[in-house]
């Protein structure tokens, strides 16, 4: 399987990333799946342009899972959709053997992706999920 590269950004190719992709692609409608992929690419480009160092796997997981709480399969709790998605991402990542602190970082990225400004004061992966969402949905940061 060849790597997917768009605008010089390569999608990580680990088994974890393949499993994340499979789950989201099978759970979300195509519009949401493709939006989530764009969030990864936009966030990665923003990070590259700002000279930020980040973990592409964590950014990809955060980007792909960030709207999973909007899907029929993962919504329905009394929580905000961001928390539903963040909880599922953390569960999935922990079950896959991701260390708790890395899974929590993805949880924070997803939980805060609709909160302007705050993520920029946190870990790069958290900031870049939000940056990718803002660019794909609102055009913020397109310069």
Question: What label would you give each PLM region?
Answer:
Residues 35, 52-58, 97-109:
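Acidic/histidine metal-binding catalytic segments
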Residues 17-35, 68-73:
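Active-site flanking loop/helix segments enriched in acidic
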Residues 3-21:
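Short alpha-helical hairpin
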Residues 39-40, 80-95:
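An active-site-proximal "capping" alpha-helix that borders the catalytic cofactor pocket
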Residues 1-7, 27-33, 37-52, 98, ...:
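Divalent metal-dependent phosphate-bond-processing catalytic cores, especially two-metal-ion Mg2+/Mn2+ enzymes
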Residues 56-75, 81, 85, 107-116:
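His-Asp-centered metal-binding catalytic motifs of divalent-metal-dependent phosphohydrolases/nucleases
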Residues 10, 91-92, 110:
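Alpha-helical, largely C-terminal catalytic domains
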Residues 29, 49, 71-79, 96:
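Short gly/ser-rich anion-binding loops that grip negatively charged ligand groups
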């Amino acid at each position: 399987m060849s790597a997917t590269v768009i605008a010089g950004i390569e999608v990580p190719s680990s088994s974890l990333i393949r499993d994340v992709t499979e789950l989201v692609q099978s759970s979300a409608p195509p519009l949401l799946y493709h939006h989530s992929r764009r969030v990864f690419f936009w966030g990665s480009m923003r990070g590259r342009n700002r000279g930020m160092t980040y973990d592409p796997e964590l950014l990809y997981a955060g980007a792909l899972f960030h709207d999973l709480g909007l899907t029929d399969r993962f919504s329905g709790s009394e929580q905000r959709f961001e928390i539903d998605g963040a909880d599922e991402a953390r569960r999935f990542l922990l079950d896959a053997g991701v260390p708790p602190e890395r899974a929590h970082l993805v949880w924070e990225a997803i939980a805060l992706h609709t909160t302007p400004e705050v993520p920029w004061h946190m870990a790069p992966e958290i900031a870049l999920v939000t940056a990718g969402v803002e660019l794909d949905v609102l055009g913020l940061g397109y310069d």
